């Protein structure tokens, strides 16, 4: 009886102080008490050796039943058990890219210039690439594009057909048509090449020797930086070759090119002498639309005093144009048919954010008046052209439309005081939040890792882990590449 009483005391103290040692001691003491009780109950009915064996067996069974299941139930998850693919850990300076296609492969570019293609179907595929090569995925994720010394090599995902090599630097890949720019003896030309019949170009037009490239989508850039962007700078930064070909003419400015004919589409997108940023982005998400609109070309031009004017085009025609923003020192991000500017307004030192979108001509704070009535934010996990993801004082992770402030979805956190770490990218949220210890055998330092499809808040992967995570890289399709010091794993999808 004394042993059983001690077991009860240990169980109570362990539950109160959340001490695992006391909880285990309670199970062992309960087993010992049960064995002693059986020994006393049997008395002299059996031989001594038999009585001892039965009592010891009961003690072992009771102790195991009270400890082993409890220990197993609180063991943290292992990343590799939920992994779609496992590869070497990510290091500083290594890039991870995914195409907007939801389940396309993931391109990993290592610091030494080597590269890997990762997918659920083929696992980890090592790519032959020199450090100076530019590697990118097509916008639909079905092809890999490799540029070496002005030679473009296009490989179909899965190796269904032989790679196609085309002389020149790629500007875009629209379906099966690759638009390239090649120069020889001071003469430059643009060509459209059907990858199904690459021997003869579909069309060829002359191009100026002086040119520049568009800007990377979703990347924060100085608004008034007059430095010319290289033809492949955006492709190298995003790891994706766009499907809309954009051409810079030093006499006219920026033009959109029809990949089927090589002719300019619509009006001049931005004048040659203006300080403008330009990129082709997906259209803003519209849940009410029966069919998603095609890509849009965004421009944002800076005036002499730093005021910004943003314009959205579709097929060379203006969809909307913003009014001038307040003058100031701004960086801009072109993403999902909207322009997000961060910086300081002239005459102030406080940094803020303003947004230009299809909603109205005036620049406004992200979320507009739609988030004015929302509960106070405690942290922001990320923002892009479509949504911003925040945490609030009620212990929730909430997504709002970046332009309208409309509530999109909500997920719970473990507690309002939980420390939260994570990020938003490629329409995916990766969040790591602390878990409160509620049971004595819960390990210390547990955190819950969730990969969330930012489009609708669907959790595509969820683990409770005690591992030290060094990198959280969100990817398209509700996936993420998570790295520790020992390995990196692809989760979600």
Where are these regions (language model features)?
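N-terminal "mature head" segments of proteins
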Residues: 2-171, 485-493
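A structural motif specific to WD40 beta-propellers
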Residues: 126, 161-163, 200-203, 263-266, ...
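Loop/turn-rich, solvent-exposed surfaces of beta-rich toroidal or solenoidal domains
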Residues: 374-454
